[in-house]
Amino acid sequence: MYCPFCHNDQSRVIDSRVIDSGSAIRRRRECTQCKNRFTTVEKAQLLVVKRNGLTEPFSREKVIVGVRRACQGRDVSDDALKRLAQQVEERVRLHGSSQIHANEIGLAILEPLRELDEVAYLRFASVYKSFESADDFESEIRLMRRRDRSN
């Protein structure tokens, strides 16, 4: 890590704290040469393997954008979307792998979204599961009701 002030490559860690529910570490550093202090954030990179085989870094923002579309016109706050995106990231990181397939992210979105707003869940599921008819919606609603009764 180079000092942002003098570009020296030696620094010492003064303080370390876990942030983002344990998914990152914030370190306060001091340059051994100029004595200026700066902060770094370390996070294990999570790559998403897309359907076409390409990879890209996981983005909470992309989760929020996709779910926001399903929540359009619904009473769902930005804070609730941010919490959902954090839950999704935590869930996919539990796989313990540095790469995850895009469809697994969709699966990780479904349950927290259902708990947040059932209409938004149905909208998202209709795209994610490629619903083709009203029968697909009816089947999903029956499945939701069965799950509700068993809980």
UniProtKB/Swiss-Prot annotation:
Span of zinc fingers (unnamed): 3-34
Species name: Corynebacterium diphtheriae (strain ATCC 700971 / NCTC 13129 / Biotype gravis)
Alphabetical keyword list: ATP-binding, DNA-binding, Metal-binding, Nucleotide-binding, Repressor, Transcription, Transcription regulation, Zinc, Zinc-finger
Cofactor: how and how many bound: Binds 1 zinc ion.
GO BP field: negative regulation of DNA-templated transcription
Function: Negatively regulates transcription of bacterial ribonucleotide reductase nrd genes and operons by binding to NrdR-boxes.
Cofactor dependency: Zn(2+)
PROSITE patterns: ATP_CONE (PS51161)
Domain ATP-cone as annotated: residue spans: 46-136
Entry annotated with the keyword Repressor: yes
Family the UniProt entry places it in: Belongs to the NrdR family.
Source taxon at top rank: Bacteria
HAMAP family linked to this entry: NrdR
UniProt cross-references to Pfam families, sorted A to Z: ATP-cone, Zn_ribbon_NrdR
Molecular functions (GO terms): ATP binding; DNA binding; zinc ion binding
InterPro entries in the record: ATP-cone_dom, NrdR-like_N, RNR_NrdR-like
Name this protein carries in UniProt: Transcriptional repressor NrdR
Annotated disulfide bonds: none
